[in-house]
Amino acid sequence: MKTISRQAYADMFGPTTGDRLRLADTELFL
């Protein structure tokens, strides 16, 4: 099974559990 980087996965499918999400241009992270 080929693996891809977290960045590549996020680019294709959006953020996944465990990724840090920055809300718009704020300093809030989820």
UniProtKB/Swiss-Prot annotation:
UniProt signal peptide: none
Gene3D superfamilies for this protein: Urease, subunit C, domain 1
Gene Ontology molecular-function annotations: metal ion binding; urease activity
Taxonomy, superkingdom: Bacteria
GO biological processes: urea catabolic process
Location in the cell: Cytoplasm
The protein, known as: Urease subunit alpha
Organism: Escherichia coli
